[in-house]
Each structure stands twice: as C-alpha cells, then as structure tokens.
C-alpha cells in the first residue's frame, strides 16, 4: 500500500485511483476543497474518527470529502461531487 504525502495531506494511492474512476474526482482536486474559506466541516456521527467537508475546488465543483486525522496529517478517504442537498447546505449554510 503506497501512501502519497502532499504537504499536510496524505492518501492511499490505490484508493485514490479507484475513487477517481468511480466518482471522477481526484484526491489532488479534493484537497483544494480544504482551502475553500467557505467550506463546511462536520464530524461524522457514525464514525467519530472521520470528518466530512463540503467545499469548492478550483475547478468550481462543490465536493463532498471524507477525511480522517492521521497523526499530524489529514488523510483523504474519499471524495465525490456533492449531491444537490449537500450543495444547498454549502450555498445556504447548515440549518440551525
């Protein structure tokens, strides 16, 4: 299992290739969503070790990214285009 490290991010190379084939989103594009100042991050309820981010990439696509803390780095687990309801959360904010 080859781990790719890019700055404060890391991911499994085979997982990244499979994710891009399935969802059409590379993990390099996914890490751009972390740079979005309007991105929304939440801890997953089912898995306390994972976090979800809805943010925009430089390509202008709103992405849904699942990540986990891995020591001092953020490990990208999966990434896909946001669903319409997730996009609304991004555009209008989570309901209080």
Language model feature labels by segment:
Residues 1-96:
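Ribonuclease/tRNase effector modules and their secretory precursors
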């Amino acid at each position: 299992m080859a781990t790719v490290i890019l700055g404060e991010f890391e991911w499994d190379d085979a997982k990244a290739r499979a994710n891009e084939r399935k969802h059409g989103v590379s993990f390099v594009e996914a890490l751009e969503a972390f740079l979005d100042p309007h991105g929304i991050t939440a801890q997953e309820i089912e898995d306390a070790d994972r976090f979800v981010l809805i943010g925009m990439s430089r390509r202008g696509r709103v992405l849904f990214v699942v990540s986990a803390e891995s020591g001092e780095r953020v490990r990208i687990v999966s990434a896909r285009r946001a669903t319409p309801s997730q996009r609304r959360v991004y555009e209008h904010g989570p309901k209080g």
